[in-house]
């Protein structure tokens, strides 16, 4: 009798919702309102994919910006001042960089929060996943496990870097960055950060392409193989570029260690100012520091 009462209650329409028949109620078929509510996990999953893609694109651009030190110290200095608004303001404004970093931090925290939904929430869930992974022995499942741990590491490593850029945006320059990396003993953190971010980003882009069917073609298996090759090439290229760039900053930091704290001054601008000749236009704006 209690079972009959429960079925009747479940089949009763609530707040204008169409009535469920007794057979559906007995089988436990969810109501339409519950089906509508179940769309939220899919929306959050889409938001996680979008935030991850935006962060990956930012990291690609960021790597090319910081690697400009391989071209010359002046090239990196010019790019740093450009992002402080030197090209269109009377003088560079480091707070512009802080604003950009703040947006990146917000996106980073959003992506981390969305990703935490899929982490094992208890030791029991962790054990179940490990058993599942060992039974399947599927490469993509293993990649997700690697991505989970690199993401966990990034939560701490990237936060240190972002906080420094947020609070001290004026200390971005050839000498300043090299001093922070070498004299400030930050190079181990940057080395770990480099491996974590490139491995995590490469796997993330690969899984995004698989999930949304990008670049797979008519043959899914052949498309998956192409994506694996692209993922490997992506990670190797940016790891190589990052290691060479970090080595360049370390070498500059070693050479500049006895003058740590000295700000970089462009040679051309310094010589002209010493000769009481001021460069004009965009060249002068890009060569100035705040307050000069």
Write out the residue ranges for each language-model feature:
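Membrane-embedded alpha-helical bundles that constitute the cytochrome b-like, heme-associated redox core
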Residues: 2-292
């Amino acid at each position: 009798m209690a079972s009959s009462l429960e079925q009747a209650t479940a089949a009763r329409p609530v707040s204008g919702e169409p009535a469920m028949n007794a057979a559906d109620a007995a089988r436990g078929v969810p109501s339409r309102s519950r089906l509508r509510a179940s769309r939220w996990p899919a929306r959050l999953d889409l938001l996680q994919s979008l935030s991850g893609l935006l962060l990956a694109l930012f990291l690609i651009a960021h790597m090319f910006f910081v690697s400009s030190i391989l071209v010359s110290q002046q090239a990196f200095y010019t790019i740093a001042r450009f992002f402080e608004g030197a090209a269109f303001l009377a003088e560079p404004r480091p707070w512009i960089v802080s604003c950009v970093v703040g947006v990146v931090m917000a996106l980073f925290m959003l992506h981390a929060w969305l990703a935490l939904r899929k982490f094992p929430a208890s030791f029991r869930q962790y054990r179940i996943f490990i058993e599942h992974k060992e039974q399947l022995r599927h490469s993509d499942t293993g990649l997700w496990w690697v991505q989970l741990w690199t993401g966990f590491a990034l939560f701490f490593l990237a936060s240190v870097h972002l906080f420094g850029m947020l609070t001290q945006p004026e200390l971005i320059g050839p000498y300043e960055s090299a001093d922070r990396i070498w004299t400030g003993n930050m190079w181990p953190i940057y080395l770990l950060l480099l491996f974590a971010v490139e491995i995590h980003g490469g796997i993330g882009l690969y899984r995004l392409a698989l999930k949304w069917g990008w670049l797979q073609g008519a043959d899914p298996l052949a498309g998956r193989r192409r994506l694996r090759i692209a993922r490997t090439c992506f990670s190797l290229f940016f790891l190589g570029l990052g290691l060479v760039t970090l080595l360049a900053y370390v070498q500059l930091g070693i050479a500049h260690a006895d003058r740590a704290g000295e700000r970089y001054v462009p040679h051309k601008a310094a010589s002209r100012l010493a000769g009481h000749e001021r460069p004009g236009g965009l060249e002068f704006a890009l060569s100035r520091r705040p307050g000069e």
